[in-house]
Amino acid sequence: MDKNELVQKAKLAEQAERYDDMAACMKSVTEQGAELSNEERNLLSVAYKNVVGARRSSWRVVSSIEQKTEGAEKKQQMAREYREKIETELRDICNDVLSLLEKFLIPNRSQPESKVFYLKMKGDYYRYLAEVAAGDDKKGIVDQSQQAYQEAFEISKKEMQPTHPIRLGLALNFSVFYYEILNSPEKACSLAKTAFDEAIAELDTLSEESYKDSTLIMQLLRDNLTLWTSDTQGDEAEAGEGGEN
């Protein structure tokens, strides 16, 4: 199937909410080796975000059930085995994406915006791996995530307006990384607040086409700040849950 047909099929799969099919199409497009257009890049991102998101959600539910079944050995064993099955799927998906990033996407990009987008993606998928990692593996995975986010963050500060949705989405996810993975609420709040304040100060630079995406992510940053600075702690919002790239 040629590239245009694969892209069309990916769009069809998205409308049908068949994200595994959508991801398979965009994986094939990526493996053809050409640099992806913005539209193709977003299709790839949306597909895998949904594919991995379903497993992350399942993993949280089953982990919670596993913890609650202490004392009921058979039930706990069943929950543990099921969690491990979901973990295997989740790891395979993350490794798939990380392989595409390393082999094709990061080397083939020509614009700083694309580099930030793909390095953010690399940080995200190592973060998802870190959520389910344990023991000796975890530190290396966490380091990989932090390095990718940090590199993306440095480039975004040099090359992008504070209101750019990719720069804002990166700040959002990097702050979630500090809060959830590194257990550093002060650093998470500082990063999120700085990103929000810098964007507010330059609202007049917002382009019409990115207005909706940027303001949505700013709202998510503010929601997280409210959550993190209050006594109640729930699930943090994350870029992509609403309408980020």
UniProtKB/Swiss-Prot annotation:
GO biological process: protein phosphorylation; regulation of ERK1 and ERK2 cascade; signal transduction
Residues the record lists as Phosphothreonine modifications: 232
GO cellular component terms attached to this protein's record: melanosome
Coiled-coil annotated spans: none
Keyword vocabulary terms for this entry: Acetylation, Cytoplasm, Phosphoprotein
Subcellular location: Cytoplasm; Melanosome
Residues found modified as N6-acetyllysine: 3, 68
Modified-residue entries (Phosphoserine), positions: 58, 184, 207, 210
GO molecular-function term, one example from the UniProt record: protein sequestering activity
Record site: Interaction with phosphoserine on interacting protein: 56, 127
Tissues expressing the protein: Highly expressed in brain (at protein level).
Modified residues (N-acetylmethionine): 1
Disulfide partners: none
Family: Belongs to the 14-3-3 family.
Protein function: Adapter protein implicated in the regulation of a large spectrum of both general and specialized signaling pathways. Binds to a large number of partners, usually by recognition of a phosphoserine or phosphothreonine motif. Binding generally results in the modulation of the activity of the binding partner. Promotes cytosolic retention and inactivation of TFEB transcription factor by binding to phosphorylated TFEB. Induces ARHGEF7 activity on RAC1 as well as lamellipodia and membrane ruffle formation. In neurons, regulates spine maturation through the modulation of ARHGEF7 activity.
Record text on subunit structure and interactions: Interacts with CDK16 and BSPRY. Interacts with WEE1 (C-terminal). Interacts with SAMSN1. Interacts with MLF1 (phosphorylated form); the interaction retains it in the cytoplasm. Interacts with Thr-phosphorylated ITGB2. Interacts with BCL2L11. Homodimer. Heterodimerizes with YWHAE. Homo- and heterodimerization is inhibited by phosphorylation on Ser-58. Interacts with FOXO4, NOXA1, SSH1 and ARHGEF2. Interacts with Pseudomonas aeruginosa exoS (unphosphorylated form). Interacts with BAX; the interaction occurs in the cytoplasm.
Protein name per its UniProtKB record: 14-3-3 protein zeta/delta
Organism for this UniProt entry: Ovis aries (Sheep)
